[in-house]
Amino acid sequence: MIFVQQFEEVRSILEKAKKITVLTGAGASTESGIPDFRSANGLYADANVEMYLSRGYYNRSPKEFWKHYKEIFQINTFHQYKPNRGHRFLAELEEQGKDITILTQNIDGLHQLGGSKHVIDLHGTLQTAHCPKCKSGYDLQYMIDHEVPRCEKCNFILNPDVVLYGDTLPQYQNAIKRLYETDVLIVMGTSLKVQPVASFPQIAKREVGATTILVNEELTGQEYNFDFVFQNKIGEFVEGLSSMK
């Protein structure tokens, strides 16, 4: 009964909210079949991964960098992954006229493929790369088709649009600005272990006074920063909300 009441309350809050911000992590994409790279069995378990994905390694050995980059993120099979119910739910809220912005730690681009227009890619995206000289952009298929992708105009080895270790977060200030404008923060599918993103719920709750909602299978240790906690898969949460119609 309490569970049903929580869903009813959250549905009512979302209907009344003027500005909704959603923070998503790996759990938003695992239901599409994408591995959680930071899990115990994920590719981040390799001790060398942080080096391979670092700005310094790209600068020193760009050809070797691209070899490891493609292996780590399984670039050649990435087209098989499709947006799931959670991605579509957020896009549907936007289609209903809601002012909703997604702050995602994911680099898969599935929020955009699912139809969301206002997405801030905190860690960049796998879907594109660019020339470090002329800034021309290239898509995922171009990266797949070329062992070491180079700019067709300049012949420079492309720079991936993923934020590498050693880079700053270029979208951080945009994310913070949005956070301070929001009525509701929904955190979905993230363990909240990586800073500075781990501080977002506290900012929203303590400084902004927003309503905060957590949807995650595992406890995060930050439950005290949330008004509502759903220990569920995102798809289950969406189905629960949908059943309140």
UniProtKB/Swiss-Prot annotation:
SUPFAM superfamilies in alphabetical order: DHS-like NAD/FAD-binding domain
Protein location: Cytoplasm
A Pfam family of this chain: SIR2
Keyword field contains Zinc: yes
GO MF terms, alphabetically ordered: histone deacetylase activity, NAD-dependent; NAD+ binding; zinc ion binding
Main location: cytoplasm
Domain of life: Bacteria
Ranges in a coiled coil: none
Chain sites annotated for binding NAD(+): A26, T30, F37, R38, Q105, I107, D108, H123, T190, S191, N216, I234
Cofactor(s) named in the record: Zn(2+)
Active site: H123 (proton acceptor)
Binding site for Zn(2+): C131, C134, C151, C154
Domain Deacetylase sirtuin-type, residue spans: 1-245
EC number: 2.3.1.286
Residue sites binding nicotinamide per the record: F37, I107, D108
GO cellular component: cytoplasm
Cofactor binding remark: Binds 1 zinc ion per subunit.
Catalytically driven reaction(s): N(6)-acetyl-L-lysyl-[protein] + NAD(+) + H2O = 2''-O-acetyl-ADP-D-ribose + nicotinamide + L-lysyl-[protein]
Keywords: Cytoplasm, Metal-binding, NAD, Transferase, Zinc
Function: NAD-dependent protein deacetylase which modulates the activities of several enzymes which are inactive in their acetylated form.
Family: Belongs to the sirtuin family. Class U subfamily.
Protein name in the entry: NAD-dependent protein deacetylase
Organism listed in the record: Bacillus cereus (strain ATCC 14579 / DSM 31 / CCUG 7414 / JCM 2152 / NBRC 15305 / NCIMB 9373 / NCTC 2599 / NRRL B-3711)
